[in-house]
Amino acid sequence: MKTWDDFLAAMAARHAFFAKAGCVVSDYGITEVFAAPYTEAELKAIFKKARAGKSVTAAEALKFKSAWLFEGLRADAKSNWTTQLHYNCLRDNNTAMFDKLGPDTGFDCIGDWSVTENLARLFDRLEREDALPR
């Protein structure tokens, strides 16, 4: 995958794979609600920069994560899936169980970061584009 458009196509292919397998619910385990404004031109430039092995700024990374989340939720809405946002997730915080079972095996916890503003921004944009999932 070389371009932003390739990335979007890969996301769509994975979504279709899970839909074909009978999936009707998605769960996004995210550290925070990503909802920074961005343009498609910015995303193409950010993706190109990262693919060239150059470091992206924190602001660029946030724009990319915001677009990734938005596109995933848009696909969920299009497929009439139910979406769970597992936000403020602190992953793999039990070292003994991580060593025994590996990553993402259920030993996570929820943090106490503020999310209201970003959640409202994300849901409003999804609603305006008729892409708010269940």
Q: Where does each model-flagged region fall?
A:
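Histidine/acidic residue-rich metal-binding segments in metalloenzymes
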Residues: M1-P133
